[in-house]
Amino acid sequence: MATVTDPRDIILAPVISEKSYGLIEDNVYTFIVHPDSNKTQIKIAIEKIFKVKVDSVNTANRQGKRKRTRSGFGQRKSTKRAIVTLAAGSKPIDLFGAPA
């Protein structure tokens, strides 16, 4: 991604799973991000969208699962995930929109 004006083009969706939900207590959040984005762009986008201080960003490319269909085999879409650690003392991100 050469130039992105909107940080919401980089951060696509939060990952809501049992593992990612357990990591929220440690100020670690997981997001599905644009496949061409790098760690610096992800950090800037998280800080702009949620107004928090990011400590570190780890990324992982997940290969799409091979699935059987009636006519043969297909493949789910591959995704890139970002595991974002917030700085100590930073306010938590409200992913669920419920009052605390």
UniProtKB/Swiss-Prot annotation:
Disulfide pairs here are none
What cellular component terms from Gene Ontology apply here?
ribonucleoprotein complex; ribosome
The record's keywords, sorted A to Z, are: Ribonucleoprotein, Ribosomal protein, RNA-binding, rRNA-binding
Return one Gene Ontology term, BP aspect.
Answer: translation
Question: Where are the membrane-spanning stretches?
Answer: none
Q: Pfam families, per this entry?
A: Ribosomal_L23 (PF00276)
Q: Name one GO molecular function term.
A: structural constituent of ribosome
Q: What does this protein do?
A: One of the early assembly proteins it binds 23S rRNA. One of the proteins that surrounds the polypeptide exit tunnel on the outside of the ribosome. Forms the main docking site for trigger factor binding to the ribosome.
Give the matching HAMAP family. Answer: Ribosomal_uL23_B (MF_01369_B)
Q: How does it assemble?
A: Part of the 50S ribosomal subunit. Contacts protein L29, and trigger factor when it is bound to the ribosome.
Q: Which family does it belong to?
A: Belongs to the universal ribosomal protein uL23 family.
Identify the NCBIfam families for this entry.
PRK05738.2-4, PRK05738.2-5
Name the UniProt record assigns to this protein: Large ribosomal subunit protein uL23
